[in-house]
Amino acid sequence: MKNSIVVLFLLISLSACSQNSEYNVSSYQTEGTKAPNTHYIGEAWLNAIIHDDTELGYNITKATFKANSTLDWHTHSTAQVLIIVDGEAYYQERGKDPLILKVGDVIKCEKDTEHWHSSTKQSDVTYLALYGSGKPTAWTEVLTQEYYDEIAKMFLHD
């Protein structure tokens, strides 16, 4: 009798697992993989939550940058929306003043608009980036540590 009950529980568990395998579930809470230091200085992790989904037509990526990390100037071939879920970020579009984004802030960057965004000098940042399935990011100019430090000093005086 005990063996029958054990077998029954195992079958129910296997059945539940097979039912769950019918779904493609990902989590934005997963840190992701450490990004190679190609277009930034510091430490960053990326989690491609939804990537190249042709039915949806957009991607969702979670990015986490440690404090005092930079991200180079770049453009996207589609609009991009950033949703700040933890920490604080610097954000700047070419020709405009930089600003600080905080938890709960949502900002849209129009397609082909040159911009950069990253953690602040004192705070890590985690954000969700929503963007279309267009061409890859076009990296346009290195954001120097000196320029980043100038931005940080500017906000210390505010």
Where are these regions (language model features)?
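Short beta-strand His + acidic residue motifs that chelate non-heme Fe in jelly-roll/DSBH
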Residues: 73, 91-92, 114-120
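Conserved short histidine dyad/triad with adjacent acidic residue
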Residues: 59-76
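Sec-dependent N-terminal signal peptides
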Residues: 4-14
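Short acidic-glycine-tyrosine-enriched beta hairpin
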Residues: 95-112
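A short hydrophobic beta-strand segment most commonly corresponding to one strand
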Residues: 122-141
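Glycine- and acidic-residue-biased ligand/ion/polar-headgroup-sensing regions
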Residues: 76-90, 94-95
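A short, N-terminal "cap"/entry segment at the start of jelly-roll beta-barrel domains
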Residues: 17-57, 138-158
